[in-house]
Amino acid sequence: DCKYGYDIHDGVMRLTLLRSPTFPNAADKGYHEFTYSFLPHKGTYREGQVQKHAYELNNPLEVIWGRGEKKETGCGSLIQCQTEGIFIETLKLAEDGNGYIARAYEGFGTRKKAEIVLMPGYKVSECNMLETDDTEIATDKNRFFTVFKPFEIKTFRITCKNIKC
């Protein structure tokens, strides 16, 4: 949803829901829906896990019912991060059709060693944002470690280890 902002002055909180100028064109006229949330918490935004709660609000979990037989154990996700403050922001098909692209970033402004887990049967390489210059990353039990600088964005290519994926 990401609307326009907020301000706090003299103990009064205000939320700007819509900015709709009429010049040069009637940009935002029409029907609008808003989702907003107040998250009281103690301590810093890190201690209050504000980014985590924001993701949960803007990307609610969807349950899809079905039947199937679990054949292999794993993390349940193609990729997931085990390190607080590292966020996997994007997962998409690679532009060249060779695997998937995951983008992750460090969101707390600190240097961090991240532990990332892959679903069994996949391998990973780090590439640039244009999805070129791949450098394969060694995994151990479907896990790998990488160091993020403050606010750094990293791009990973995830592909099958063999043709059966």
Locate the predicted segments by residue.
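Terminal accessory/anchoring regions of large secretory-pathway or extracellular enzymes
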Residues: 1-165
